[in-house]
């Protein structure tokens, strides 16, 4: 058989001789985590990377993180590499105009042009930057773990080191939900342009060594939407930081207070259905809805609150710290997760960890996560949601019991140590399968 000639990739000679055979045994693994967006206080990506990296380190593994904006500050012993980038989605300088010197960089130029034409290039460009950063460091790692970037750059990384990725849920679901809510052809075109990176993610994910996902429901949906066979998918449910999210003794629950941690205009999050449910409940009884965050100015949520005439019943907190969020949980009778779909449902688990009753929809993996520790209603059904809220407001002792049950469920099933152990199993499978 004729030996295959090596391939030149940005100065790297890539061939079979570069594929290291790793004998992992029981020794600690050397792991590199990648995430294109990493706010550790809000947004699932930063929370996932922060907690998983620390849990892996706690198991004795060696971890480095390549982080997109705004970046992470992790515990000592977990180095964080921050590739230079344009950071065009920085809320302090949103969609700034880069300098000519910055645009002389081809990756920066592609990113800027895509943003100017209403695309979302961050996953693509971050993957290329990660490849450039890591190209002289591949020998340091046993495995590279991407967090739903799924960029073509990963295929370059995969030539040198076993590579896995976490897909929290298929983004096609977000796109299709947004399209159903779109009112005009122009808006539909904008949505399709924004989600144009999905084709890349499908192609890349099919070529990686293993895919990690966070629930059985997400596993089924990824198989259907991305065409990945189930035997290449490993389910490793997310955890929750139980040192932070915990019951707080001594704080009395307000038996009229309901909270939700999402203020987004994104249709998938289902906040509009909760607002309509609050309208129904407020006609018959005293109720307060506390929404963590702030609505987009003149956005869907803000307009709907005004249209329904429920301003006196709804309070938006603005940005809160993690400790303030836990205090909000402690003061509330119940927390609501009104999402039309969740690949996992971190807000539900955080609420359960704080000992607060959860009212959740059946969207996506939420029934799998909440189990019998909460009240489940059909997704997108404001009448059913209003009935569930009214019942717990009428019987607060039932809400207290659900809160205790949820807390026990979290400790049994949803710690970050458990998540890290299952993630390491996926790493080991990927390393053994690497050819």
Predicted regions and their residues:
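Carbohydrate-associated surface elements
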Residues: 217, 239
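Conserved donor-binding/catalytic core segment of Leloir-type glycosyltransferases
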Residues: 251-278, 290
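Aromatic "clamp/platform" in nucleotide-sugar-dependent glycosyltransferases that forms part
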Residues: 340
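Short hydrophobic beta-strand element within catalytic cores of glycosyltransferases
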Residues: 357-360
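Conserved acidic donor-binding segment of nucleotide-sugar-dependent glycosyltransferases
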Residues: 375-382, 391-396
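Acceptor-binding helix/loop patch of EC 2.4 sugar-transfer enzymes
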Residues: 93-118, 158-202
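Short alpha-helical donor nucleotide-sugar binding micro-motif in glycosyltransferases
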Residues: 319-320, 327-332
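Nucleotide-activated donor-binding/catalytic signature segment of Leloir-type glycosyltransferases, i.e.
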Residues: 300-323
């Amino acid at each position: 058989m004729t030996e295959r000639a090596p391939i030149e990739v940005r100065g790297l000679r890539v061939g079979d001789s570069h594929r290291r055979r790793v004998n992992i045994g029981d020794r600690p693994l050397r792991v590199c985590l990648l995430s294109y967006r990493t706010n550790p206080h809000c947004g699932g990506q930063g929370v996932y990377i922060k907690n998983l990296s620390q849990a892996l380190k706690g198991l004795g593994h060696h971890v480095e993180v390549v982080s997109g904006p705004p970046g992470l500050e992790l515990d000592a012993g977990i180095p964080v590499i921050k590739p230079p980038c344009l950071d065009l989605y920085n809320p302090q300088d949103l969609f700034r105009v880069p300098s000519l010197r910055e645009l002389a960089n081809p990756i920066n130029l592609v990113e800027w042009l895509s943003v100017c034409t209403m695309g979302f290039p961050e996953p693509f460009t971050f993957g290329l930057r990660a490849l450039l950063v890591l190209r002289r460091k591949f020998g340091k790692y046993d495995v590279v773990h991407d967090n739903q970037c799924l960029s073509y750059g990963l295929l370059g990384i995969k030539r040198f080191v076993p590579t896995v990725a976490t897909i929290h849920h298929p983004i096609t679901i977000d796109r299709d939900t947004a399209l159903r809510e779109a009112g005009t052809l122009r808006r539909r075109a904008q949505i399709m342009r924004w989600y144009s990176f999905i084709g890349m993610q499908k192609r890349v994910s099919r070529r990686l060594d293993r895919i990690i996902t966070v629930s059985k429901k997400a596993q089924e949906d990824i198989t259907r939407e991305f065409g990945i066979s189930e035997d290449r998918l490993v389910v490793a449910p997310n955890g929750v930081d139980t040192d932070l999210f915990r019951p707080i003794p001594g704080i009395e629950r307000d038996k009229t207070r309901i909270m939700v941690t999402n203020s987004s205009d994104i249709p998938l999050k289902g906040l509009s259905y909760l607002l309509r449910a609050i309208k129904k409940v407020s006609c018959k009884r005293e109720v307060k809805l506390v929404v963590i965050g702030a609505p987009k100015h003149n956005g869907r949520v803000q307009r709907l609150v005004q249209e329904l005439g429920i301003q006196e019943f709804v309070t938006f907190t603005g940005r809160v710290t993690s400790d303030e969020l836990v205090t909000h949980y402690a003061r509330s009778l119940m927390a609501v997760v009104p999402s039309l779909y969740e690949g996992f449902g971190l807000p539900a688990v955080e609420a359960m960890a704080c000992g607060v009753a959860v009212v959740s929809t059946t969207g996506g993996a939420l029934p799998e996560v909440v189990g019998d520790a909460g009240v489940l209603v059909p997704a997108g059904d404001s009448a059913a949601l209003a009935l569930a809220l009214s019942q717990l407001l009428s019987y607060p002792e039932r809400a207290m019991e659900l809160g205790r049950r949820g807390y026990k469920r979290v400790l049994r099933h949803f710690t970050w140590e458990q998540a890290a152990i299952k993630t390491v199993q996926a790493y080991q499978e990927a390393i053994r399968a690497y050819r």
